[in-house]
Amino acid sequence: MAILGLGTDIVEIARIEAVISRSGERLARRVLSDNEWAIWESHQQPVRFLAKRFAVKEAAAKAFGTGIRNGLAFNQFEVFNDELGKPRLRLWGEALTLAEKLGVAHMHVTLADERHYACATVILES
């Protein structure tokens, strides 16, 4: 296995909160997949939930080397937790097509947050 990409992102949670205060749920609609949206709607800390998802998706886009453009969208990267609570990534649409084209066989996700920040790293392996 070879490392195909590595991406890291850090998000200031207060910035996400400010955007939600100004524009309502538009950011969440743009960033979250349908499954994530269902969780966000009833989450006890929706701003923190969104900030963490945003960080993972930005890190993933960086790992792919593309950023969010050329057909890639935030909601094509879905963050979920396995049975032990470990964050994982599921890809849809153009993100899945790109992963297949690059030969991505494994995606590793780490996610951390504290009072003011959420941070994520994504590693893509062949």
UniProtKB/Swiss-Prot annotation:
Molecular function per GO: holo-[acyl-carrier-protein] synthase activity; magnesium ion binding
GO biological-process terms attached to the record: fatty acid biosynthetic process
Subcellular location as annotated: Cytoplasm
Principal location listed in the UniProt entry: cytoplasm
Cofactor(s) essential for the protein: Mg(2+)
This protein's GO CC annotations: cytoplasm
Catalyzed reaction equations: apo-[ACP] + CoA = holo-[ACP] + adenosine 3',5'-bisphosphate + H(+)
Xref: InterPro entries: 4-PPantetheinyl_Trfase_dom, 4-PPantetheinyl_Trfase_dom_sf, ACPS, Ppantetheine-prot_Trfase_dom
This protein's record includes keyword Metal-binding: yes
Entry EC number(s): 2.7.8.7
Keyword Cell division: no
Binding site for Mg(2+): D9, E58
Keywords, in A-Z order: Cytoplasm, Fatty acid biosynthesis, Fatty acid metabolism, Lipid biosynthesis, Lipid metabolism, Magnesium, Metal-binding, Transferase
Family: Belongs to the P-Pant transferase superfamily. AcpS family.
Job of this protein: Transfers the 4'-phosphopantetheine moiety from coenzyme A to a Ser of acyl-carrier-protein.
Protein's recorded name: Holo-[acyl-carrier-protein] synthase
